């Protein structure tokens, strides 16, 4: 009989340190809260210090040990500085969640090269920057878990989202390559692919009528940031110790049924 502990416990991440990019608001902040409420010490980063300060205050109010760093994930030097500060503050880095993302709906005919590049740079290049720096500064020698936030809309394509589906498809491919190369070092790399989440800025930008969009999935509702964050928790934890290179789709089955064609 195994002596492995159940994953369904409040101290699942006790003793671990997690970094969440784009962690000041929305899914990133909820992910930091969920990881922290399960015992992790949490560092968050994004570009706006005021948002980071408010987020850390909220996390600390819940008894979570938290810190922040101002960082543009497109800049390798800033990413490196933030990870070095996490290591100085907490002494280790066990979990990296690449959540920073950009999004805005626009038809391809109106999408500028700079607009396309901006989203690819934040989503894909940012994921590369953070993952590579974390690996070189800590994970290569100590192991750990990387969870990359992607999407499911790239599986079929979606109107008004050419820049996003391109970036997310790149994240999927990058994640699998990292899983293969870094597995021998004890580094697991997995993907969470969320669908529409109620109340998030992404949903507000993409769909004015969130309920109409959500009803396209078999569960007939939008998801919540908590439901997605709990998927991240699983992949970040030792409960997923034999899982790498995998994608956990958390979209109510929408990728099976939703049309990418606008109404």
Per-region residue spans from a language model:
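Short, small/polar-rich loop/turn modules that mediate ligand/substrate recognition or access, typified
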Residues: 97, 183, 188, 243-245
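Short C-terminal tail/terminal secondary-structure segment
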Residues: 2-9, 156, 233, 244-263
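Conserved glycine-rich cofactor-binding loop
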Residues: 17, 24-26
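Active-site helix of classical SDR
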Residues: 131, 167, 175
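Alpha-helical segment proximal to the catalytic Tyr-Lys
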Residues: 136, 180-184, 241
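Substrate-binding pocket helix/loop in short-chain dehydrogenase/reductase
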Residues: 107-108, 115-120, 203, 213
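C-terminal substrate-recognition "lid" of short-chain dehydrogenase/reductases
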Residues: 128, 221-250, 255-256
């Amino acid at each position: 009989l195994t002596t492995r502990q159940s994953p369904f416990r409040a101290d699942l991440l006790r003793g671990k340190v997690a970094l969440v990019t784009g962690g000041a608001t929305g899914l990133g902040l909820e992910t930091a809260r969920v990881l922290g409420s399960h015992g992790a010490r949490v560092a968050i980063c994004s570009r706006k210090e005021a948002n980071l300060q408010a987020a850390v205050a909220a996390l600390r109010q819940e008894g979570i040990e938290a810190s922040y760093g101002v960082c543009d994930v497109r800049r390798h030097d800033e990413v490196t500085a933030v990870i070095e500060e996490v290591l100085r503050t907490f002494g280790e880095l066990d979990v990296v969640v690449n959540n920073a993302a950009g999004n805005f709906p626009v038809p391809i005919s109106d999408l500028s090269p700079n607009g396309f590049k901006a989203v690819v740079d934040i989503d894909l290049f940012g994921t590369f920057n953070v993952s590579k720096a974390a690996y070189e500064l800590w994970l290569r020698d100590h192991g750990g878990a990387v969870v990359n936030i992607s999407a499911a809309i790239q599986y079929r394509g979606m109107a008004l989202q050419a820049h996003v589906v391109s970036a997310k498809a790149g994240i999927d491919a990058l994640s699998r390559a990292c899983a293969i190369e870094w597995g021998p070092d004890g580094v697991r790399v997995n993907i969470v692919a969320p669908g529409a989440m109620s109340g998030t800025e992404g949903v507000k930008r993409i769909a004015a009528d969130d309920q109409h969009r959500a009803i396209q999935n078999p569960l007939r509702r939008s998801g919540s940031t908590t439901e997605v964050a709990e998927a991240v928790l699983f992949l970040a934890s030792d409960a997923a110790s034999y899982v790498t290179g995998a994608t956990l789709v958390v979209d109510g089955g929408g990728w099976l049924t939703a049309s990418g064609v606008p109404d």
